[in-house]
Amino acid sequence: AVKDSFGNIYEKSPEDMHWRIANEVARIEAKYPNALTAKELYDLLDHFKYIVPQGSPMTGIGNDYQVASLSNCFVIGVDGAADSYGAIIKIDEEQVQLMKRRGGVGHDLSHIRPKGSPVKNSALTSTGLVPFMERYSNSTREVAQDGRRGALMLSVSIKHPDSEAFIDAKMTEGKVTGANVSVKLDDAFMQAAVEGKPYVQQYPIDAANPAFTKEIDASTLWK
């Protein structure tokens, strides 16, 4: 049911919600040929006979009391060079803004240079991707959605030299508690794990001439 920030409830039944959605969609439909009427749209939604909207669209469509996303989930990132500190912070800000509006967020960290890589600032070397996992995780815990924590998925390519540290960070109790994590495995890694052969990680992960490489035992990491 639609409610405002003071807790006032403006819908008393699922029918009220379906009429709100139908009226708003009909308002947009009216701008185009062969538009469906609000009643026709309502009949599609009623008792979820033919259409079952996602949770966020059910909340956001025609809602004059909240700024809510019209999609449940978003995959975000930065076009171009994305391993600068500014780009990393920009992703964090975008993540928070989406979560404030009920959006679940997923993004990949394979663009972040691995630990020990040279950087052009006073630190001289990169901290790697694990501290930024924690940053994004903490942002998720800080953003409440009507009492519910935001939803975050972080991923990394197995080809990234920090992928093992990425896995370990989630396994460490209390470290990355605001995110689910996923490692993207490729055929070369799985073949190396099966055959007991070494596997070469690199950064950038798609570079023909990578700036950094690291050889690992694929079967040991798999276990």
Give each language-model segment a name:
Residues 1-223:
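Extended catalytic cores of very large enzyme megasubunits
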